[in-house]
């Protein structure tokens, strides 16, 4: 879509969402590269164009880095968006990092400066991955992984990714894909519960991992328990695809840990700026080390989730709710993440809910109407989900006549 195309109003009462993605050679060729080039299935730092000193505020001090960059073209919105969440797939081992930036154009025609949406490295020995607090101006503000517009809606956005490595080093840093999901909350009456989407009676065999089994673990990475819904769900998804850390990666953990891969995941998704493990983009980025692509998306109905279940792909959803709003939950959650693994023959939602006390108790079934209402509500989840898939896996076809959402 070009910047001159007319924006179509989103359906009343329905979450509006669109995903802009750049994840192959042709897509990256449409942007502006500086010191980076496509090679071996990724955009790589090949000829650094500058040096900078980056001061890590979380303990590693200042280091000199050499860098290149890639800047996307402007991506127009089919509606006036209020929120944007970038996500990415990148190879950035110790000694490398990427910085993801966002610029918006509002419906009044004004362009913003660059917002920093994250400094990312898959390890933590050289630099700490972190978002940047305190970014706010007349056009919007950044809260960890999410940009929220103020005043005017967003008519277009662009992303810039800086690929950096320690000056004089030879670490390979590569960008395999970058995305931006933009959304607008529902307007008007709450839509009726969605009907069948093709996956009723399909339940995927996703291993169960409880965050409750890790209470008190690794306090430097938020201490397990209620804080580890993201790591538990991400570990489940990675394990579903037969991937994950090996025994040699886990030697620093307690040998009696019931599921050390959850602790490992928590360490490697922890956002030192946000001081937590719930950064959606970081959870979607972590699995790149195992050859998995991840993306943060927003979906307006469970019928979209059913498309992924039918394709054999479980998906993580984020919800906030009071216990009275979700029958069977047994407790309230200010910000939980659950893996949707399928649907009953009657259309109710089969999940792995990591709030359970043990791995054996995570499988639960929630009423379709209640789950969908909570997940889609503006204060309950806003339709946020993140998905993982192996390189080369075909995703479900887009919904005809609607903006792409994955």
What are these model-derived regions, one by one?
Residues 64-69, 80, 139-141:
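Short linear interaction motifs
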Residues 1-10:
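Actinobacteria-biased recognition of intrinsically disordered, low-complexity terminal regions
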Residues 79-93, 161, 321:
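A short beta-strand element within beta-rich, extracytoplasmic domains
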Residues 13-63, 76-79, 99, 104-114, ...:
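Noncatalytic regulatory segments and standalone regulatory/sensor domains
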Residues 65, 79-81, 95, 227-231:
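Short, surface-exposed loop/turn motifs at beta-strand boundaries within globular domains
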Residues 38, 59-63, 72, 253-405:
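Conserved active-site-adjacent core of cysteine acyl-enzyme catalytic domains
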Residues 93-101, 334:
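Short coil-to-beta strand junction motifs in C2/discoidin
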Residues 19-21, 162-276, 403-406:
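Active-site-adjacent structural segments surrounding the nucleophilic cysteine of cysteine proteases
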């Amino acid at each position: 879509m070009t910047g001159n195309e007319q924006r179509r109003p989103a359906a009343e009462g329905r979450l509006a969402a669109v995903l802009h993605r750049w994840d192959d050679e042709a897509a990256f060729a449409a942007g502006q590269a500086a010191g980076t080039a496509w090679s071996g299935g990724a955009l790589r730092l090949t000829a650094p164009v500058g040096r900078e000193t980056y001061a890590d505020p979380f303990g590693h001090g200042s280091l000199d880095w050499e860098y290149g960059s890639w800047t996307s073209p402007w991506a127009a919105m089919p509606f006036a968006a209020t929120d944007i969440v970038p996500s990415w797939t990148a190879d950035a081992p110790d000694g490398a990092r990427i910085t993801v930036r966002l610029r918006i154009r509002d419906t009044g025609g004004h362009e913003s400066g660059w917002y920093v949406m994250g400094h990312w490295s898959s390890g933590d020995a050289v630099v700490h991955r972190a978002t940047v607090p305190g970014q706010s101006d007349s056009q919007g503000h950044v809260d960890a992984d999410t940009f929220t517009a103020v005043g005017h809606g967003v008519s277009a956005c662009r992303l810039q990714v800086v690929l950096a490595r320690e000056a004089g080093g030879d670490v390979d840093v590569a960008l395999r894909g970058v995305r931006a999901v933009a959304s607008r909350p529902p307007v008007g009456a709450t839509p009726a519960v969605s009907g069948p989407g093709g996956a009723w009676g399909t339940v995927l065999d996703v291993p169960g991992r409880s965050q409750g089994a890790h209470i008190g673990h690794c306090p430097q990475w938020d201490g397990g328990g209620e804080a580890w819904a993201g790591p538990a769900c991400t570990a489940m998804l990675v394990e579903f695809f037969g991937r994950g850390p090996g025994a040699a990666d886990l030697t620093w953990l307690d040998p009696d840990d019931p599921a050390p891969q959850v602790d490992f995941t928590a360490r490697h998704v922890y956002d030192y700026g946000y001081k937590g493990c719930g950064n959606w983009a970081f959870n979607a980025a972590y699995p790149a080390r195992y050859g998995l692509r991840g993306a943060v998306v927003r979906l307006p109905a469970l019928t979209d989730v059913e498309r992924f279940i039918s394709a054999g792909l479980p998906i993580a959803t984020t919800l906030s709710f009071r216990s009275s709003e979700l029958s069977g939950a047994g407790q309230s959650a200010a910000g939980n993440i659950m893996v949707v693994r399928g649907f009953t023959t009657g259309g109710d939602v089969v999940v792995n809910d990591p709030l359970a006390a043990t791995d054996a108790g995570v499988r639960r079934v929630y009423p379709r109407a209640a789950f969908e209402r909570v997940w889609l509500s503006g204060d309950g989840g806003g339709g946020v989900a993140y998905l993982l898939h192996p390189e080369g896996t075909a995703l479900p076809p887009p919904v005809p006549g609607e903006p792409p959402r994955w």
